[in-house]
């Protein structure tokens, strides 16, 4: 209430002043200047009202500035001397504070001292008396420093409220000035309370002032005051972190650089310089992006404002701009990037300004120029050092390797170079893959190293390249294989087709000869039965065997004469053995069927005597119910003696582990509910498009279309047809001509108008010309057949060869036979107890049903299980996919269409032969039809005979194969047989790929999980190490951060750490661990570090809190950026014992710059901020 009354009183007095009325006298009976008595307040009032108004004990006495009064803000009424209040109260009534009040004050004290939780924990465990004593000492100390003596304590919320009001002009300027003083004098807790919301308000005000484009003096003053408030906020670690984390802050600071306002620009440039030296490389990128955006908006170079600041007469601004240039140029670790930034500054005009700057007498400017020149010389020396040893010839790989090795050995790059070589060794030993990998690596390295477009690369892109090269490499490998194997494959295919054709033709001729032999033998038997035996003593003019015995085709001896004492002739020889499947009997009879098995009527009844030596199949009894394999069963009565299923022995694949795995995978856990909707097949009805027909076709119009499409003179077309010119005649031309040509009667009628040729239209003229050719349509039919004959042969021959070769492959493949045996074993085990149990064989079309049999968990199929078993236990089965290579092509062949095509070819040959016999003699000199067609028909008959022989042989082969596997040719066509096998082969290969991908995915997931765990472990180790580095500072002071950074920039100490990125070769001897390519730390000579050249690989460095631990922090932080290792940390800690003496020597070298500066404290602060 008192506070509200005081504000109301202030408003009334101001209102009276505006109206010309005298203001109300001050409250109380005392006049102005009269001494007031001490105000005695209870300590409880201090506890309740002043918790947020403790002053920091870190601010020295007398350093505070009196704040200017805030308009329309009334402070706490009365001027209380809190020093006397607190001291008197503590002396008179030391036990006036309750336990809760003391604990609240104790927590507030620790918060105001910026203690973390780890440091607060031991203090909370102290006795209450100790806590109370600490609180009293804290209040007493704060009272003595005068921090509790101010009468104008304003809370952060009041400042935030006033900033939200949107005041402008002098009023806003007054608020900001008061805010700057409060941010400077109040404790960190006050700054934190204001920064949560106040920072965004300050940036909003700054953005409005920058974008307002108002050049009034008060606006510039206000803008400068906002910059000063930001600087005061950044003077704490909290404020610095907030500024660096806000996206707009750096962009607005870059836009606020105005050489016309030297004082404000100096403050802006200093803040950006501090951010550059304390932030990580990402902060540097953000600063450069902010400068680039500001330059683009103003349509100037991004560094133009900085260089213009150097042209100004203000030495303070010149020093600040040189500080920012040094911070930008020395921050990147990459040498090329540093050279790029420095050259960009030179192009903007720095080269012309440097001589003038060196003529100015100023110690601070001299320090910055010296830092700039030293870093420039070191970078140029390092750059020139790259090319010192490049004097060798690069034609030989050994010479190039020697040069590269001399360049990287005993440097930090050595580990990466060895890593590159090791990775090159990991390329798979395949000549196609190796070539494509090296080609890809060469292209990537070329694009990284060379910049042929004449401009610099995008140095702002600092992220890692994550490229998925597997698909690209696969494409390159496939392309290389195709290029190399294309010629070889075509040659081998031609040779193979020729050999197969010869082989098939030879077999066909052999079969013909055997048939001829059988025919002759039949005639011989008929002759013997008709004429009887020869008289005794007759010589048989037949060829005998080598031993003088008659050959197999010799006539038998004649029977003896009646009455002779000769024994009767021996009985006839036994019948010959049954022929092979597909072969005819000796006298042309078919193979007799096996005896009927009338006793095989029952399904579950096991016959006692099975045909062809079959033995009953083993009966399996699984412990649990199994899913069924729905195959088509083949009974013994459907098999022939040489059938495949007679000889199978699937028991050799029986394995306890296999059967247990099969049982666990395909067991029936519960009755599945099937959704009937899943079985509704959507039949796609293909609508047959009706062929379009001319409703009123006109011959003249058709001929016009034909003639316009070819544009050949009519006489020339006639000559081409008479000469049978295959070079100019084409199939489409002949077909269109036959289609649109008038019939013979119309042609004869048009021949009467030869005298009126010129008066006829073009189609009629063409018809008149063509009417002179005798028997035109038979000619065109024969020519078209001749043009298409070669294509027909080339189409029929490969199809016949594909089917024939596929039949041989199916029958001869041992791996395919083993696969069928394994499937038979698995099927009998799964079907145990059902009607399909104890099966002797199954129809090959059942193989396609393997992928339809799901496992118990619905995650795999029986086909995938079979593939997995073959991979693990029976790898000799997998080659069946290659054994049946021609199965794919054979599955696309229609045997019925082959037979029709061959019959059509035979009919065309007969028709052509009849036409040649009845063709009239030629009357025109150009008529060569009979001559060319007579020679063509001879060649065509020869090819037709070969194709007929090959087709007969193919028919016998597939009949033999289907009989071999007990396939009923009446129920299953050849196309269905090959399609089923090809679908199974394709599904098997697909399942094989899916199993491989599944294993690779599982392995990849495992590696990713291990890598993630390793990365998380390393991250935790890095966090613990950073936490340890943060706790190494003994004091809890978090204020004065920006003051220390600006001091470091001004003295040049902030840039010394950047000059020690990488020592010279002889100062740091790095070795490579035999088990890893990571560098192992060795002892560093920090005394000579400054005078040596740095290497191109520049890792981040940090400076530790104390001078004795500085080298340790540097090396440790370097390793934390890559891989944290216990061995490295131990090696670094061993180095710490000798670091103090080296650090003292280094301090002597640095003393010439500024003897009064506190270098360890500055570097410790930098190290701590970088660690954060």
UniProtKB/Swiss-Prot annotation:
Residues 1-36, 57-96, 535-586 are annotated as: Disordered. The modification Phosphothreonine is found at residue 47. GO terms for cellular component: actin filament; actin filament bundle; cleavage furrow; cytoplasm; ESCRT I complex; filamentous actin; microtubule organizing center; nucleus. A motif (Nuclear localization signal) lies at residues 16-39. Residues 616-1014 form the FH2 domain. Expressed in testis. Present in Sertoli cells (at protein level). The modification Phosphoserine is found at residues 56, 155, 1073, 1158. Transmembrane segments: none annotated. Pfam families: Drf_DAD, Drf_FH3, Drf_GBD, FH2. Residues 553-581 have a biased composition (Pro residues). Belongs to the formin homology family. Diaphanous subfamily. This is Protein diaphanous homolog 3.
